[in-house]
Amino acid sequence: MAASHPYFNLPDFTQPSPPSTPSSLTSNHHNRCGPSNATKGLFVALLGGGLSAGFVGPFSRMAYQTSQLPSLELLIFRCLFHLPIALILKFRGDPLLGPPDVRVRAFLHAILNVLSIGCAYSAVQVVPAGNAVTVRKGSSTVCSALLALCLESQRLSGYAWCGLFGSTLGLIIIVGPGLGTLQEGTTGLYTALGYVLAFLGGLALSLGLQVYRSLHFPSCLPTVAFLFGLVGLIVSVPGLFVLQTPVLPQDTLSWSCMVAVGLLALVSFVCVSYAVTKAHPALVCAVLHSEVVVALMLQYYVLYETVAPSDIMGAGVVLGSIAIITAQNFSCDKEGQVEE
């Protein structure tokens, strides 16, 4: 039945129509061509998740270059934008920490997301923003596909696998030449560490998406968004004073970057969390590769950092793969038929 499909929540058209309903109207009612729920989720991930998140990495790097802003301080500022969501939960009468039976998983989701963001912010400070985003998104896509196959036995169509392979290939084209020219000594060590942090950030992101898909309760999205801010503050504030040195920005550019990072990251968090409930997590991560293209454009036009021909070629492959993934999910919802 369509109602039991793991990715779609289609209306129940199995009930017999009234005798007075003309057959032509019934046929039109049961044969609706348009984007499926998965396609809608992918569009939300593309427009709200990928494009907005593409600005986060370059803006974070700008704040670091301008005021030497520590990564944990930027994470703290971002978490502050999540705390007002508690007002929504209070207004609806829902518990701030979620129902007791899923509270542990909700906190685990928040911890994984904080770890992912912390690794990402640290990575963009030592490697080019576009490359850091590339490694993080590539690892999240591959890990999401493997986790979905191992934990949920979810099948992907041939077009989906083609899109996943193409998007991952595009990321390899972008970051491959840079990995082959790492410098020896301290500089090369820090650069390699940045790529490792970016990979761990992608792994934590994929795990967090899988945990979120297992949460089913009212106000799930605002609850996990608030918990992200709460856990992020609890972890980051002590870590800032122990591991890093707090910096109070004195210029308008740094404050503008911090506000932009907080707002755009919140929008991306909400859109990605919504999208992963509608579509396969690996496909969502693949569509989020649009963040790489945006980051590369800002890296060249705003940060004035070099963009190699391989970056442009890889970005084109990524965009083509996103088009394949999105197009293969555009379908006609018909009575008694469900996409595989």
Curated annotation (Swiss-Prot):
Q: What is its main location?
A: membrane
User: What segment(s) does the record annotate as region Disordered?
Assistant: 11-31
Pfam families noted in UniProt: EamA
Disulfide-linked positions? none
- Ranges where the EamA domain occurs: 51-176, 223-327
Subcellular locations according to the entry: Membrane
List the InterPro entries hit by this protein, alphabetically.
Answer: EamA_dom
Respond yes or no to whether keyword Transmembrane helix is given for this record.
Answer: yes
Q: Membrane spanning segments where? A: 39-59, 69-89, 107-127, 160-180, 189-209, 223-243, 257-277, 283-303, 307-327
Provide one Gene Ontology cellular component: membrane
How this chain sits in the membrane, per its record, is: Multi-pass membrane protein
* Top-rank lineage group of the source organism: Eukaryota
- List the keywords (alphabetical): Membrane, Repeat, Transmembrane, Transmembrane helix
Q: Identify its protein family.
A: Belongs to the SLC35G solute transporter family.
Return the protein name.
Solute carrier family 35 member G3
Q: Which organism is the protein's source? A: Rattus norvegicus (Rat)
Q: Which gene encodes it?
A: Slc35g3
